[in-house]
């Protein structure tokens, strides 16, 4: 029986945390509004979730991944701003 993948925050968050941690240079680039940073991170997020799901993501799933990845980046930005 195939494993069902559910794109919920509980499932996505550990995956996306790994994307943030593994691509800190691009996260800094995103914070600096460097061209291409968001696209790179969005692509890495979709790729990581697709690998975990074991299949291509549906359009709505990709949009959920992008939205949650953006949320993660906003959390990083807010923490950096609060520290300064």
PLM feature spans:
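Short alpha-helical "patches" and their helix-cap loops
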Residues: 7, 60-64, 84
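N-terminal non-cleavable signal-anchor helices
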Residues: 20-21, 66, 77, 81
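N-terminal acidic leader/helix
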Residues: 2-47
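Short intrinsically disordered terminal tails
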Residues: 1-4, 80-84
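Short, charge-rich amphipathic interface segments used for partner binding and complex assembly
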Residues: 40-75
């Amino acid at each position: 029986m195939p494993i069902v993948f559910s794109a919920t925050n509980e499932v996505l968050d550990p995956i996306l945390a790994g994307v943030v941690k593994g691509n800190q240079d691009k996260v800094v680039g995103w914070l600096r509004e460097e061209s291409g940073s968001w696209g790179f991170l969005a692509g890495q997020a979709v790729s990581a979730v697709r690998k975990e799901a074991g299949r291509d993501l549906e359009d709505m799933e990709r949009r959920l991944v992008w939205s949650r990845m953006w949320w993660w980046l906003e959390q990083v930005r807010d923490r950096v701003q609060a520290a300064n």
